[in-house]
Design a protein with these regions (language model features):
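Contiguous, small/hydrophobic- and glycine-enriched helical/loop subdomains that border
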Residues: 1-92, 111-114, 120-130, 134-137, ...
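Conserved RNA-binding domains used in RNP assembly and mRNA/RNA metabolism
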Residues: 146, 163-210
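Polybasic "coupling" helices that flank or enter modular domains
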Residues: 129, 143-170
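Active-site beta-strand/loop microenvironment that shapes enzyme catalytic pockets
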Residues: 93-104
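Short linear motifs in intrinsically disordered
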Residues: 58-60, 154-161, 177-183
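Residue-level recognition of well-ordered beta-strand positions that form the cores
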Residues: 28-30, 96, 179
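Cytochrome P450 core scaffold surrounding the K-helix E-X-X-R motif
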Residues: 102-113
Length: 210
């Protein structure tokens, strides 16, 4: 595991810049899972973050597909999973987790409407060390459960706030619109189009349709 309190070149999905000010919690977990468990890593990380924030700070969280953790509808944490394959085997996987803990989000007006922090929500600082310990304990519990074959998509599904709602999904140059009907055990979004057909989407940017 690699742990940092600040990043100068934080990176999110699709190579996007991730604002990583002092006061946050930024960690990368290095794993060597089997190929069949690779897709579950984002689910595991998202659930671990949500459980840790709720357990330590008492804040109610929700998840935004595919890799964001929200509080009061604003992003409080993001997850990035990358891996390297050698043939059909996983050489290693990196799960990066960034949590806005004691960051003053008002200092970043460009993201303030969309992002929040634990301190912003509580009005006080919390121990980043305690949050990191709780997060890693939850991650280990979930990871070992997944390795033992225990499904966790039901909890993930229950925490996804956009299921059952009309959404727009943008991935690359493509856009799909429809009802966010479900997610499968690999974390793919099942979208039901207006004509009744279904699309299975592995990744993309989701927004609610007005």
């Amino acid at each position: 595991m690699v742990l940092a309190g600040r990043q100068t070149a934080g990176r999110g999905r699709l190579g996007r810049f991730w604002i990583s000010p002092r006061g946050g919690l930024y960690l990368t977990v290095v794993l060597r899972p089997s190929a069949e468990h690779l897709k579950s890593l984002v689910i595991i990380a998202a659930l671990a973050v949500a459980r840790a924030i709720e357990g330590l700070a008492g804040l109610q969280t929700s998840l935004k597909w595919p890799n964001d953790v929200l509080v009061a509808g604003r992003k409080i944490a993001g997850i990035l999973s990358e891996s390297e394959l050698v043939g059909e085997n996983v050489s290693h996987a990196l799960v990066g987790i960034g949590v806005n803990v004691n960051a003053d989000m008002a200092a970043y007006p460009e993201t303030a409407p969309l992002a929040t922090s634990v301190m912003t929500e509580l009005g006080r600082e919390v121990s980043r060390e305690a949050l990191a310990a709780r997060l890693l304990n939850e991650f280990e519990t979930l990871y070992l459960a997944a390795q033992a074959g225990k499904p966790m998509d039901e909890e993930w599904r229950a925490r996804l706030g956009m299921l059952g709602k009309e959404v727009r999904v943008r991935f690359g140059e493509q856009v799909e619109e429809g009802l966010a009907e479900d997610v499968d055990s690999d974390g793919n979004l099942i979208l039901r189009r207006a004509d009744g057909s279904r699309a299975t989407i592995a990744a993309g940017d989701v927004t609610l349709r007005s």
